[in-house]
């Protein structure tokens, strides 16, 4: 409710809501619909990865437009054990198919639990796309990491156990 009030108090949001919905009413549902539409508008189909993938038959084949180091990183992404990055970022656009708890330290954010009211969903969030990730920090649902090195360090040594931690990370 506080977000609804805050947005309604800003003149240009009322104008934008009127353009989008026919009147200036700001509601949770309209905010949700607007955000969902915005996220769907972010399309990346000409990344260096997309271009390389179009040149080969399989994800694990070396991409001709990648350096040796980039191809090595791609193999690690798909095959590193015990858990590869692609275990969670598992679609063609590297978005996860389910919300997950990725073991962030000191995370008090309810995540999906705020919607489902189930304690099994505490700390679970949508797995974001990794397309063009290097050009769009900050990282994690709360923006706590500013570099990809920090993200890698988290997954290497920083995962905090909790009852709802994703099984791929246990």
Q: How would you describe each model-predicted region?
A:
Residues 47-166:
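Short glycine/threonine-rich turn/loop motifs
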Residues 1-57, 62-66:
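Extracytoplasmic redox metalloprotein regions
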């Amino acid at each position: 409710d506080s977000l609804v009030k805050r947005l309604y108090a800003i003149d240009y949001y009322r104008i934008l809501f009127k353009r989008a919905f026919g009147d200036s009413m700001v509601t949770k549902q309209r905010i949700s619909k607007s955000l969902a539409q915005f996220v769907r508008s972010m399309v990346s189909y000409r990344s260096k990865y997309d271009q390389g993938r179009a040149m080969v038959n399989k994800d694990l084949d070396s991409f001709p437009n990648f350096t040796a180091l980039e191809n090595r990183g791609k193999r690690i992404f798909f095959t590193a054990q015990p858990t590869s990055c692609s275990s969670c970022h598992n679609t063609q656009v590297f978005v996860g198919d389910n919300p997950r708890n990725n073991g962030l330290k000191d995370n008090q954010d309810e995540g999906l639990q705020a919607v489902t009211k189930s304690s099994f969903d505490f700390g679970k969030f949508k797995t974001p796309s990794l397309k063009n990730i290097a050009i769009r920090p900050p990282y994690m649902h709360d923006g706590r990491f500013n570099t990809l090195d920090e993200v890698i360090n988290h997954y290497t040594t920083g995962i905090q156990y909790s009852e709802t931690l994703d099984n791929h990370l246990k």
